[in-house]
Amino acid sequence: MKKIIFAFVAIVCFGLSTAMAQNVNTDPAITQFVEQYFPKATIQMVMPDEDDIDVVLNDYTKLEFRLNNEWKKVDCEHSTVYSSVPTELIPEQITAHVNANFPGAIIKKLEKKFRGWEIELNNGLELKFNSNFRVTEIDD
């Protein structure tokens, strides 16, 4: 009986959270960002919380924005349309480092941190850069 009640509560909570996420008005700055960098995709879901705003596009690209609508993270790992993060979003120093040290690698995730950057390549490597674009960590 407890399992049935738990399952029912879980389904109701999921349904409410999905309904709330879909009914949120998207800020024009976020819409403009999507139209500029992901013109072949549309916003599927917007999920704000106390720290940031998560956005999922209809091609499964995931975006994360700070509360001031500044983009924070772009994740194209599961995108059905975009094979990599748009090059316009990637700092030139990071692109140069990846091209020089990982020829043919594609940047699937890009995150702006407060003190640097973090990327994930299509080969599974994660690289962290400080604010001067020096690699501080490589993780596989």
Regions found by a protein language model. Give the residues of each.
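Structured core of small recognition/catalytic domains
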Residues: 1-5, 135-140
